[in-house]
């Protein structure tokens, strides 16, 4: 059928908030359990339920701040709930799935289907951002007639005529087979808190949180 009924975005978000609140309540009910109760099967936090709670609240905060332009009252109330309950604030609590076989290496390193966009590369190049070394691979560039190693991003929508030539001309994500899958980190949660303060709280607090988020990103 060409007339399939779809849930509205509002219905989807409402259901997601309900499910997430149910999960948070369940986690809170099990806070007293020792970490070894779930640790064997938990590749993210090794059974630490307090850390799972921080991640769940951080997800709620992320969802809430995506509603600021369409449901500002709901965004504010849900974000306030999440912040009050406690979100990720340190890199030690970052949500990462640990693995000995990160399969995204197939996408980035083997198949060569992805390269870094010019927008982020140009921005970070402009600030000589030291995080590039940890995030991206280098490529050979020509500057003043000399070959150098640097970072180059590909423009969105560019016409790729030769994949082999293209993949060697632009920087890639730096990913190894033992890298964890990052789901959410303290920097993102802190940037979201800064946005919350900027919209509904204190501009001074927003500035402080913004700087904290930048620091957390560099420390990571």
Q: Could you say what each language-model-derived stretch is?
A:
Residues 1-220:
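Structured, solvent-exposed acidic/aromatic patches
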